[in-house]
């Protein structure tokens, strides 16, 4: 009987070693050699401290900063572990809202978000990405239109000329990947860091 099982056991051990150890270690080594910043999470540092990742959004709420998309991520409720509470940009619990198009809760949230956005800029249509969360809830980017929509609020809060902010946004626009994939976008963390440098 051992004779019949032995080839299967040898194959199991060999493939486990190959796919569980050799391949991941080889890919990690290649990534560290060719793309070390990306392999380590595209971390962004300021004054020697890691302040975030270019790949994961952050919850900016101060009027002096550009805001990202809403995040639907949650965390366990400290008072009742069977429930959850909102925890924007919680990378440990990446998910969308899972609310359907006929959901009353979704309609209520969208209406409140649109009304809040209109307070900052009542004359322009609200870009959809300022009121809808991404599938992961962690999207670090917004459309150039969403960034431009926020210019009046940021300019007023900082006392900066709107034309300077529009020029700053233009300098931060990332084009389509390979010239055809995705849409032009602005990384909110990088934009806010550039904003702080400009104001300094």
From Swiss-Prot:
Cell compartments where the protein resides: Cell inner membrane
Annotated region (Disordered), positions in chain: 68-97
Ranges of Polar residues composition bias in the record: 71-96
TM region positions: 9-31
Membrane topology designation: Single-pass membrane protein
Main localization, broad class: membrane
One GO CC term on file: plasma membrane
UniProt KW keywords: ATP-binding, Cell inner membrane, Cell membrane, Ion transport, Membrane, Nucleotide-binding, Potassium, Potassium transport, Transmembrane, Transmembrane helix, Transport
GO MF annotations in UniProt: ATP binding; P-type potassium transmembrane transporter activity
HAMAP family named in the record: KdpC
Description of how the protein assembles with itself and partners: The system is composed of three essential subunits: KdpA, KdpB and KdpC.
Function: Part of the high-affinity ATP-driven potassium transport (or Kdp) system, which catalyzes the hydrolysis of ATP coupled with the electrogenic transport of potassium into the cytoplasm. This subunit acts as a catalytic chaperone that increases the ATP-binding affinity of the ATP-hydrolyzing subunit KdpB by the formation of a transient KdpB/KdpC/ATP ternary complex.
Family note: Belongs to the KdpC family.
Protein name (record): Potassium-transporting ATPase KdpC subunit
Species this protein is from: Rhodopseudomonas palustris (strain BisA53)
């Amino acid at each position: 009987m051992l004779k019949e099982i032995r080839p299967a056991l040898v194959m199991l051990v060999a493939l486990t070693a190959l796919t569980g150890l050799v391949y991941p270690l080889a890919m990690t080594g290649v990534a560290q050699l060719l793309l070390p910043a990306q392999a380590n999470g595209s971390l962004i540092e300021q004054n020697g401290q890691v302040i975030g990742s270019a790949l994961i959004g952050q919850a900016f709420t101060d009027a002096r900063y550009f805001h990202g998309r809403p995040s639907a991520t949650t965390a366990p409720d400290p008072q009742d572990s069977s429930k959850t509470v909102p925890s924007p940009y919680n990378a440990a619990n990446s998910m969308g809202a899972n609310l359907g198009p006929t959901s009353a809760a979704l309609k209520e949230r969208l209406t409140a978000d649109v009304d809040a956005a209109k307070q900052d800029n009542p004359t322009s249509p609200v870009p959809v990405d300022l009121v809808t969360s991404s599938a992961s809830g962690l999207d670090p980017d917004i459309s150039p239109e969403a960034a431009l929509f926020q210019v009046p609020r940021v300019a007023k809060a900082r006392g900066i000329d709107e034309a300077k902010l529009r020029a700053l946004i233009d300098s931060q626009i990332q084009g389509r990947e390979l010239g055809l994939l995705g849409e032009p976008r602005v990384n909110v963390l990088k934009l806010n860091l550039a904003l702080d440098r400009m104001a300094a």
